[in-house]
Amino acid sequence: MCMRHIISIVLTVGPLASFGPSITASIAKPMPNVAVQTASGATVHLADYKGKVILIDFWASWCAPCKTSFPALDVLYRDYQEKGLEVLAVNLDERRHDADVFLEAHPHRLTVLFDAKGVSPQAFGVQGMPSSFLIDRAGNIRFTHMGYSGNVDASYRQEIAQLVSEH
């Protein structure tokens, strides 16, 4: 599936989910091991982070709810990084410049990765943005969130606390 087709689907379906209350689900299935790019252009595989609790968030500069969720996820990262949380914000912009402009306006400490071809959201079954996946230390997707509203922060904190306490 080409990136333009994925973006068309996300633009059509995404706003419906993104502006309403977020949808949360609890599941347990292995995380797809897809390759993404670092800011320097190096390739990393998501499985490289196995052994940590991971929050993977798919976002784009044009996604209105992402402008609110991105800083909130950075706060979560700062609050839980010493307990083993890694936040991976996977940008899906086709033009890297668009992401760079967004990132300059939103200082952050979380890890930003890039997937302009849209392989990783397809592997995760992303249906709207932002979409987040909480992964346990064994590499299993345990919780998913589609969309974003401020009231979801308590859910994130509860789920992260649960996962970081598991050994």
Predicted regions and their residues:
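Bacterial N-terminal signal peptides
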Residues: 8-18
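Conserved redox-active cysteine motifs that mediate thiol-disulfide chemistry
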Residues: 58-75
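Short active-site neighborhood of thiol/selenol oxidoreductases, capturing the structured segment around
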Residues: 47-63
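Hydrophobic beta-strand core positions in alpha/beta domains
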Residues: 55-57, 87-89, 133-134
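Thiol-based oxidoreductase modules, predominantly thioredoxin-like and allied folds used
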Residues: 85-96, 108-117
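N-terminal "domain-start" segment that seeds a small globular fold
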Residues: 21-47
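Thiol/disulfide oxidoreductase modules built on the thioredoxin-like
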Residues: 101-109, 116-161
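Positively charged n-region of N-terminal signal peptides that target proteins for export
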Residues: 1-6
